[in-house]
């Protein structure tokens, strides 16, 4: 993090999980970090990876604090809708696979789409 300026502002998406919360704590402990935005499904504003309108609203809220210097996405899921990963081809469920893809692939892409414009140039 030596390349970040003094007084940098950071965003952690997925801040309620083990990795995300550890990142938030590390950033809050850095005296050079002026502000940490920690977003997740239960935060205010809430951020749900499959809700693009909500993500846009969260980005607008974060933008009010000024430009970001660091955006970290610590999201992802292995168990979707209570289903464990498949161990046999017969267990494949297209709907569960589509939901996992939306959360693990499209969601982070939407984070980039909405929060990249907030990065300091």
Where are the model-predicted features located?
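Rossmann-fold cofactor-recognition segment
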Residues: 39-54
């Amino acid at each position: 993090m030596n390349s970040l300026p003094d007084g940098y502002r950071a965003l952690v998406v997925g801040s309620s999980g083990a990795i995300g919360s550890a990142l938030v704590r590390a950033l809050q402990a850095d005296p050079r970090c002026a502000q940490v935005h920690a977003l997740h499904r239960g935060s205010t504003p809430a951020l749900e990876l499959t809700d693009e309108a909500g993500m846009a609203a969260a980005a607008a809220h974060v933008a009010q604090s000024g430009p970001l210097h660091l955006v970290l996405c610590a999201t992802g899921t292995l168990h979707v809708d209570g289903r464990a990963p498949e161990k046999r081809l017969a267990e494949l469920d297209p709907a569960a696979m589509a939901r996992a893809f939306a959360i693990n692939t499209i969601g982070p892409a939407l984070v980039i789409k909405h929060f990249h414009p907030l990065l300091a140039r």
